[in-house]
Amino acid sequence: MYLYTNGTRLFFDVVGSRLKPLETVMQPKPTLLVLHGGPGLDHSYFRPSLDPLGDDAQVLYLDLRGQGRSARHGKEYYQVGIMADDVAAFCAEVGIEKPIVLGHSFGGYVALTMAMRSPDLLGGLILVSTAPVERGYDLDALEQLAGKNLREIAARQQTGTASEEDMQRFNTEVLPLYWYQFKPEYLSGIFGKTVVNVKSIVSRALLAKLSHLLANQPVRTLSPASVNSAESENSHLP
């Protein structure tokens, strides 16, 4: 489903309804809003693990602007603060009150920015693998785990000079280190279903500057959200 808001078109999907039966009445369920990692991925890698929560919560998956199935823009619009505004406008448009926002990795920066600017909008905040410090990889430790070549790629990534080939090799060789007991199907589950669009995102310098962007983004006033009339019937939640 698509929704037009804050000057962009966002793709989202929903698992579970807002209400569940409790004896003779319908009881509201909490809303879990999931923000994927990246930049350059989409929400789909979360589906196998989080869809079962639809029995007890309404789970909303959102593709951040420029990623997955959401609309592409110029590089100047790929900023953490703007994406946080997108999420806040999305919640207002579809009528979500006090969602529990789960942000994974890069999505955690977006969720944290939203929480810092408008804490009253959130019912809860879950950060998954979102770094709390302003530094990049421990290159010495990475070299011990993955070798000198991967250390050099990580160094280029942090300065914004990594190539597409660098990123592909880094992802396939370093991501397995995140699992205690890695299985190859874990990566196929991510990259086999995810709509990857790294080139549409601002240069790799964004990866090296997340903390700087977080600290220095000015607060922006949300523009009124509008739903495209041709798709509005499919945009509202059940």
Question: Predicted segment positions?
Answer:
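Conserved HGGG/HGGXW glycine-rich cap/lid loop of the alpha/beta-hydrolase fold
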Residues: 6-76, 90
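Flexible "cap/lid" loop of the alpha/beta hydrolase fold
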Residues: 123-158, 194
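Active-site acidic short loop of glycosyltransferases
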Residues: 7, 29, 92-98, 119, ...
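Alpha/beta-hydrolase
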Residues: 155-221
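Conserved loop-alpha-helix segment in the C-terminal half of the alpha/beta-hydrolase fold
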Residues: 213-238
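Catalytic nucleophile-loop/oxyanion-hole region of alpha/beta-hydrolase
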Residues: 71-84, 131
